[in-house]
Amino acid sequence: MKNILSIQSHVVFGHAGNSAAEFPMRRMGVNVWPLNTVQFSNHTQYAQWKGCVMPANHLTEIVQGIEEIEQLKSCHAVLSGYIGSAEQGGHIIDIVKRVKAVNPDAWYFCDPVMGHPEKGCIVVPGVAEFLCKDALPVSDIIAPNLLELETLSMQKVTNVEQAVMAARTLCDKGPDIVLVKHLSRAGYRTDRFEMLLVTKEHSWHVSRPLVDFGERQPVGVGDLTSGLLLVNLLKGESLQTALEHVAAAVYEVMVTTKEMGEYELQIVAAQDRMVAPNHKFWAIQLD
């Protein structure tokens, strides 16, 4: 069974970061080792929250403990998401290097959390710079949203063709695979939720219905998306098949959440539909 070291935020109530990705990844059939960058009472789109950012050296200490019991070599991928401080970033890169030193076949999947296309940047100073300068070159897979794609590539993206070009700019700097988690205003249609999966040689586009939650959009969708893609790829699915499953699985979670009238993602209620979606969305190869 595959093992994923997932370094992300954690909320006690609700679903964001590891709290959004950990259960779905396990439900898909992999082991997850959650390592939390922050621990908050709830996600930060509520009016208030409590909690703290973990000390940066805490991340390294935990991984060192795993290494000392000779289990780090069984880690197949490191997944990083929300980073609570720029200092944590340096420790995460060191962790990736430690894992790859004992398992050269391990992947680093970077979810470069900077913000939401409609909300602007939500991370502390220094994190965006770390992601561009340090995380991008060592990542094997990276999964930006539209704003993050523009920041990482230093290109304005207004359509799908430009998004593919920007993603290939990232491939030239490090990762083999780029998932654009949400094309937003750069997509073909504003009433659809569109994603791209891009390599140096090929690209695929997938579109699904946009589930309208009004002004109160659920948080953690990107974390769920990244986790599901990583699991699919670790299990040996093709890029196209993996993208199609992610689109359908996330749609099932969104529809279930909408049907139940909830704000928090209903990942437990939707678990069976997530693993075996009722809907199918075909990924179209662009080149």
From Swiss-Prot:
<feature type="binding site">
    <location>
        <position position="181"/>
    </location>
    <ligand>
        <name>ATP</name>
    </ligand>
</feature>
<keyword id="KW-0808">Transferase</keyword>
<keyword id="KW-0547">Nucleotide-binding</keyword>
<keyword id="KW-0067">ATP-binding</keyword>
<dbReference type="GO" id="GO:0009443">
    <property type="term" value="P:pyridoxal 5'-phosphate salvage"/>
</dbReference>
<dbReference type="InterPro" id="IPR013749">
    <property type="entry name" value="PM/HMP-P_kinase-1"/>
</dbReference>
<comment type="function">
    <text>Pyridoxal kinase involved in the salvage pathway of pyridoxal 5'-phosphate (PLP). Catalyzes the phosphorylation of pyridoxal to PLP.</text>
</comment>
<feature type="binding site">
    <location>
        <position position="143"/>
    </location>
    <ligand>
        <name>ATP</name>
    </ligand>
</feature>
<dbReference type="InterPro" id="IPR004625">
    <property type="entry name" value="PyrdxlKinase"/>
</dbReference>
<keyword id="KW-0418">Kinase</keyword>
<comment type="pathway">
    <text>Cofactor metabolism; pyridoxal 5'-phosphate salvage; pyridoxal 5'-phosphate from pyridoxal: step 1/1.</text>
</comment>
<feature type="binding site">
    <location>
        <position position="9"/>
    </location>
    <ligand>
        <name>substrate</name>
    </ligand>
</feature>
<keyword id="KW-0460">Magnesium</keyword>
<dbReference type="GO" id="GO:0000287">
    <property type="term" value="F:magnesium ion binding"/>
</dbReference>
<dbReference type="Pfam" id="PF08543">
    <property type="entry name" value="Phos_pyr_kin"/>
</dbReference>
<comment type="subunit">
    <text>Homodimer.</text>
</comment>
<dbReference type="GO" id="GO:0008478">
    <property type="term" value="F:pyridoxal kinase activity"/>
</dbReference>
<feature type="binding site">
    <location>
        <position position="111"/>
    </location>
    <ligand>
        <name>ATP</name>
    </ligand>
</feature>
<dbReference type="GO" id="GO:0005524">
    <property type="term" value="F:ATP binding"/>
</dbReference>
<feature type="binding site">
    <location>
        <position position="148"/>
    </location>
    <ligand>
        <name>ATP</name>
    </ligand>
</feature>
<feature type="binding site">
    <location>
        <begin position="44"/>
        <end position="45"/>
    </location>
    <ligand>
        <name>substrate</name>
    </ligand>
</feature>
<dbReference type="InterPro" id="IPR023685">
    <property type="entry name" value="Pyridoxal_kinase_PdxY"/>
</dbReference>
<feature type="binding site">
    <location>
        <begin position="208"/>
        <end position="211"/>
    </location>
    <ligand>
        <name>ATP</name>
    </ligand>
</feature>
<dbReference type="InterPro" id="IPR029056">
    <property type="entry name" value="Ribokinase-like"/>
</dbReference>
<comment type="similarity">
    <text>Belongs to the pyridoxine kinase family. PdxY subfamily.</text>
</comment>
<protein>
    <recommendedName>
        <fullName>Pyridoxal kinase PdxY</fullName>
        <ecNumber>2.7.1.35</ecNumber>
    </recommendedName>
</protein>
<dbReference type="GO" id="GO:0005829">
    <property type="term" value="C:cytosol"/>
</dbReference>
<feature type="binding site">
    <location>
        <position position="223"/>
    </location>
    <ligand>
        <name>substrate</name>
    </ligand>
</feature>
